[in-house]
């Protein structure tokens, strides 16, 4: 039985028979609109609604489904799909290995995952959208914790180490180089595809930064609220994050975060990962159920 687990509250993968079980988390889905530059969050619906680990949501390219990581009764970590129209959940991968952090690749025909292999090696793999035809994306680079596609040929990767490193890899050549160190798990392409964002530690604070590509010009944007480590881009100049039961937003040029919504009345607490659909109409929210 596979025991490799990526924790919600950590930026490393814990493996081995002695590892504790994964945290109990759920994925919620809510409508998202932007009015006057302010994000408005509609009623949030629990789309997983079960005891167990459901986490790491990302939307398909057509915004019609969510891919997410789920650990079920068999103890296996696989990728599942939730269809926004039919509200049906289907299993996408069912392998002897563990798959995490499903991300639809540029072109929309495959998705990439962090795969924990039988010998606990963590590398980047990809699958067809139906979970078939697995193949390795980068053979030499390991252990990979998280990733984001800058474009069809370039990847930004969180590589575990002391300290953790932000590594760029050109998938055409397999060549990799280190861009930064002491980074967090949140990596995301910029909405206009001009680069990507990452979070790194500056004077004990978690700071959101953006790197333009291919210029490799990086600049700090704003410090995240204390305890926050995840963000999602809602538009070219609007970022969302969470603190406790609250969603917060930041506009490019602002000096501080502003409140978007308090979801405590809906039972959403300890909000962590966020994902916004490509069409900007939906937000997926990971929370610890009451």
Name each region found by the language model.
Residues 19-290:
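Sequence signature of WD/YWTD-type beta-propeller architectures
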Residues 6-15:
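Bacterial N-terminal signal peptides
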Residues 1-4:
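Positively charged n-region of N-terminal signal peptides that target proteins for export
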């Amino acid at each position: 039985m596979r025991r490799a687990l990526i924790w919600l509250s950590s930026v490393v993968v814990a493996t081995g028979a002695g590892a504790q079980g994964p945290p109990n988390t759920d994925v919620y889905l809510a409508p998202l609109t932007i009015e006057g530059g302010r994000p408005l969050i509609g009623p949030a619906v629990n789309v997983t609604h079960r005891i167990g680990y459901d986490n790491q949501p990302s939307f398909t390219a057509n915004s019609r489904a969510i891919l997410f990581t789920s650990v079920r009764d068999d103890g296996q970590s696989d990728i599942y799909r939730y269809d926004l129209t039919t509200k049906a959940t289907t299993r996408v991968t069912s392998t002897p290995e563990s798959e995490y952090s499903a991300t639809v690749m540029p072109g929309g025909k495959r998705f990439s995952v962090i795969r924990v292999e039988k010998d606990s090696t963590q590398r980047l793999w990809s699958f067809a959208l139906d979970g078939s035809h697995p193949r390795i994306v980068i053979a030499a680079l390991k252990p990979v914790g998280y990733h984001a596609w800058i474009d069809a040929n370039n990847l930004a990767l969180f590589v575990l180490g002391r300290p953790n490193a932000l590594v760029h890899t050109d998938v055409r050549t397999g060549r990799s180089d280190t861009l930064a160190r002491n980074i967090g798990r949140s990596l995301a392409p910029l909405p206009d595809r001009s680069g990507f964002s990452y979070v790194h530690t500056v004077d004990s604070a978690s700071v959101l930064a953006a790197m333009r590509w291919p210029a490799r010009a990086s600049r700090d944007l704003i410090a995240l609220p204390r305890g926050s480590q995840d963000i999602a881009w809602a538009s070219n100049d609007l970022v969302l994050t969470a603190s406790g039961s609250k969603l917060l937003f930041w506009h490019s040029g602002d000096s501080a975060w502003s409140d978007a919504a308090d979801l405590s009345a809906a039972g959403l607490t300890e909000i962590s990962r966020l994902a916004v659909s490509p069409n900007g109409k939906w937000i997926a929210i990971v929370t610890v159920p009451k």
